[in-house]
């Protein structure tokens, strides 16, 4: 595996509040990385820096070996970084194929090429092993897991190299959550880098190749999956939450 994104000593404050305090981590091509942390850990701020909504006060982002500065989400997207937020940014009363091509519709000179969009959507969903019976279905009729899948498919079609998934299993049933985690594995097989941001330790451990834990703006834990287990990660997160561990004892 080779480095896709490297985050080097990133700091970010909002007034007197230090959201990120020297965060360093990396995401490689063809791997799933889980970033775990409770509310207020700094996960959302880090996502917004990677996706171009915020600039770091200090530190660097290195994408495919080159330092990058994002002035907007479009800058991140142009390099192949796609972010899938909890709201998914889908239009409920439009069909699946239209949502996949939303704002980037295929046209035939003047008119929309519905046939082409439908064919490409079906081919894409099949390639990602996403099983939806009819691409003409409106998004409002899909389950939560299927909606996640449509949002991911849209990102992949437009040449994503890295997918950020923000709490992708929140409010999903156990069965639907497993389907979303399997989708992340399929993205890994296609050579993409996947960063899953979650507070669910079990799901994060299950799907990830490597696990980071963020607490009050600092990375307090980083190990490969085979080097740790759910119990250790839970102990670390609980100990820091209760103030039983000094930051100098980072694992």
UniProtKB/Swiss-Prot annotation:
It catalyses: D-xylose(out) + ATP + H2O = D-xylose(in) + ADP + phosphate + H(+); L-arabinose(out) + ATP + H2O = L-arabinose(in) + ADP + phosphate + H(+). Signal peptide: none annotated. GO terms for cellular component: plasma membrane. Keywords: ATP-binding, Cell membrane, Membrane, Nucleotide-binding, Sugar transport, Translocase, Transport. SMART domains: AAA (SM00382). Pfam families: ABC_tran (PF00005). GO terms for molecular function: ABC-type D-xylose transporter activity; ABC-type L-arabinose transporter activity; ATP binding; ATP hydrolysis activity. It is a peripheral membrane protein. Residues 5-241 form the ABC transporter domain. Its EC number is 7.5.2.13. It is found in: Cell membrane. InterPro entries: AAA+_ATPase, ABC_carbohydrate_import_ATPase, ABC_transporter-like_ATP-bd, ABC_transporter-like_CS, P-loop_NTPase. Induction: Up-regulated in the presence of D-xylose, L-arabinose and D-arabinose. Disruption phenotype: Deletion of the gene results in a growth defect on D-xylose and L-arabinose. It is an enzyme of class 7 (translocase). ATP binds at residues 37-44. The complex is composed of two ATP-binding proteins (XylG), two transmembrane proteins (XylH) and a solute-binding protein (XylF). Belongs to the ABC transporter superfamily. Part of the ABC transporter complex XylFGH involved in the uptake of xylose and arabinose. Responsible for energy coupling to the transport system. This is Xylose/arabinose import ATP-binding protein XylG. It comes from Sulfolobus acidocaldarius (strain ATCC 33909 / DSM 639 / JCM 8929 / NBRC 15157 / NCIMB 11770). The gene is xylG.
């Amino acid at each position: 595996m080779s480095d896709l994104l490297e985050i080097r000593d990133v700091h970010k404050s909002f007034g007197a509040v230090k959201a990120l305090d020297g965060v360093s981590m990396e995401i490689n091509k063809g791997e799933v990385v889980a970033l775990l942390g409770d509310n207020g850990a700094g996960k959302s701020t880090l996502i917004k820096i990677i996706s171009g909504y915020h600039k770091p006060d200090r530190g660097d982002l290195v994408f495919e070996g080159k330092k990058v500065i994002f002035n907007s989400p479009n800058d991140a997207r142009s390099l192949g970084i796609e972010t899938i937020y909890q709201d998914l940014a889908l239009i409920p009363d439009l069909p699946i194929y239209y949502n996949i091509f939303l704002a980037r519709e295929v046209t035939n000179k003047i008119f929309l090429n519905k046939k082409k969009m439908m064919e490409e959507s079906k081919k894409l969903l099949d390639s990602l092993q996403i099983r939806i019976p009819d691409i003409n279905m409106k998004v409002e009729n899909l389950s939560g897991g299927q909606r996640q899948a449509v949002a991911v498919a849209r990102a992949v079609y437009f040449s994503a190299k890295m997918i950020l998934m923000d709490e992708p299993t929140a409010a999903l049933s156990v069965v639907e959550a497993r389907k979303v985690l399997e989708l992340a594995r399929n993205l890994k097989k296609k050579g993409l880098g996947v960063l899953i941001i979650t507070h669910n330790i079990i799901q994060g451990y299950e799907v990830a190749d490597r696990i980071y834990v963020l607490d009050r703006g600092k990375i307090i834990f980083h190990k490969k999956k085979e080097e740790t287990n759910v119990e250790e990660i839970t102990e670390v997160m609980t100990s820091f939450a209760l103030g039983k561990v000094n930051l100098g004892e980072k694992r």
